[in-house]
Amino acid sequence: MRLKNIQVENFRNHHSLAFQPEEGITVLYGPNGSGKTSVLEAIHYCALTKSLLGAPESECLAFSEEYFIISGEFVSTRGTSLSVKVSYGKDRGKLVQLNQSEVKPFSQHVGTIPCITFSPSEIAIVNGSPGERRRFLDNALSQSDRRYLDELLDYRRVLQQRNALLLQLASSSGGSREMLDLWTENLADLAAGVTLRRISFLGELSVYFEPLQTSLAGKGSHLVTYRSSFGTIDSGLSRDELRDRYIKRFKETQRQELLRTQTMSGPHRDDLLFLSNGREIKKYGSQGQQRAFLISLKLALFRYFSHRLPESPICLFDDMFSELDAERTSEIFNILEDCGQTILTTTDGSLHPASQAVSVTALPGYRGG
């Protein structure tokens, strides 16, 4: 997949802007606050229908404006043209269109334009809460496996229903134990499917991650493993076997769950463990080591997508090279040369000779950040 051009109107600090990136590596440079990240965010909207930074649409409006429009033109590996339009108005909400047809729900669009991102705030994947790592997992799998996304959404819906029933039972305001058993069985089956797919994905991702991390961090053991709130999950466990174990666990903890009015184990409570030479990098890695670990994860994700999907992903990397030395920066650029279309932002336009440098202030329509 390749972005041909993108145009924005009333988005962030851009009242009108157009951008045509190169096929390979494009370095979009400019001073801090000039709107470089906003360009990546607009592309991210076209790919995944939401902000790169996790911001609500209302925060993406240009100052004093009532609406924004993002229009992107893409071309697939087979030469098929894709037109994406994302618009938002205070009075009507968000609208996503693909080739002039409305997309509903928005989740139907996920995976159409594969996209891999890096932003400084994503270091929380390595050193933040378990929720950040689960989000990384779910975002990656949702783009590459439609069935996973559907099952994850079903899991979240059933989890919400079960928690609501636990609250009803705890407060004696309705519900029945028979109904709880039914929701428990449904949740256990979905939990088994989500968990097993996550574990399988990490095994596939590790094939690409470990050599990349070795090239950036040096020889040693670099591992990404799944940490289940359920306990150890034996290799080769079937979905039915794991479902039965979840049912047993839910029944064992039912009294505590009624007291807390929440489901205490399952994929929504799981985590990832990142190890470098046997030590948890979240606790013992320096900022530079943690950043290199995250970059290796993202580059591994590119290779995973490239081998699994019919379309090569677009890479959107925001301020990736700060805190990295010249040797690591050069090594990453060498890897990026094989990564299809990559758009980087930086304050320095002379990072690497293989890249095309474009000043954000020189883009058509630019009026200042």
Curated annotation (Swiss-Prot):
Q: Which GO terms describe its molecular function?
A: ATP binding; single-stranded DNA binding
Listed A to Z, the keywords are:
ATP-binding, Cytoplasm, DNA damage, DNA repair, DNA replication, DNA-binding, Nucleotide-binding, SOS response
Protein name (record): DNA replication and repair protein RecF
Annotated GO CC locations: cytoplasm
Lineage top rank: taxon = Bacteria
> Which Gene3D superfamilies does the entry link to?
P-loop containing nucleotide triphosphate hydrolases, RecF/RecN/SMC, N-terminal domain
What's the stated role of this polypeptide? The RecF protein is involved in DNA metabolism; it is required for DNA replication and normal SOS inducibility. RecF binds preferentially to single-stranded, linear DNA. It also seems to bind ATP.
One family from Pfam that matches here is: SMC_N
Q: Where does the protein end up?
A: Cytoplasm
Where does this protein come from, organism-wise? Answer: Chlorobium luteolum (strain DSM 273 / BCRC 81028 / 2530)
Family, similarity comment:
Belongs to the RecF family.
GO BP terms: DNA replication; DNA synthesis involved in DNA repair; double-strand break repair; SOS response
